[in-house]
A protein has these predicted regions:
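P-loop NTP-binding core
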Residues: 1-188
């Protein structure tokens, strides 16, 4: 609901987004070509309203799955990444219902680490009731620094989850945070 990928990867400012498709305002899934190998369905801040707008919709947890199936997304792409908001609301429920492999990005800090159990329980519920193909394929440590805190969180994650924690970590990088301010996408 924050549209961070759209902001970070494109100069998109106007036009239809995933919000209009999910709320039935348009049928065609809008796709932007970021580069030859990366396409993006844009989002905007209006996506934050989708939880309210779809709160009474029938089968609201599978709207995104239906949208992606109608657009034959799995037939047209090798990988589809669904960037979820940092909450367990309707958008995240829709993404998990439409997914098979779920990667959990986890900031190497104490509070996100403590929330991992709730995310795991949420995915288990989706797996048991809505999508038997949904499972955690890995945990990706993000904003990692060589600090005692980051190392401690990584150690605890590896003790608790073993090989589910990816070996690769995304280091904290101020240039990534500055890129949208300078109107640069992070791919270039």
């Amino acid at each position: 609901a924050q549209a961070n990928l759209t902001t970070s990867l494109t100069n998109f400012s106007e036009g239809e987004t995933i919000y209009e498709v999910m709320t039935g305002k348009t049928a065609q899934l809008p796709v932007l070509e970021v580069n030859e190998k990366l396409h993006l369905v844009p989002a905007s801040l209006t996506l934050a309203m989708v939880d309210v707008e779809l709160s009474t919709a029938m089968a609201r947890e599978s709207i995104l799955k239906d949208v992606l199936e109608r657009a034959n997304v799995s037939g047209n792409y090798d990988f589809v990444l669904l960037d979820c908001p940092p909450s367990l609301g309707l958008m995240t429920l829709n993404a998990f219902t439409a997914s098979t492999d779920i990667i959990i990005p986890l900031v190497s800090e104490v509070l996100p680490f403590k929330g991992l159990t709730m995310i795991n329980d949420f995915i288990s519920m989706v797996h048991n009731k809505l999508n038997p193909n949904a499972h955690i394929s890995g945990v990706l440590i993000t904003r990692w620094e060589g600090s005692k805190l980051s190392k401690g969180i990584e150690l605890k994650l590896r003790e608790a989850l073993g090989d589910t924690v990816f070996k690769v970590k995304i280091r904290k990088n101020i240039r990534l945070a500055e890129a949208p301010l300078e109107n640069k996408n992070i791919v270039d």
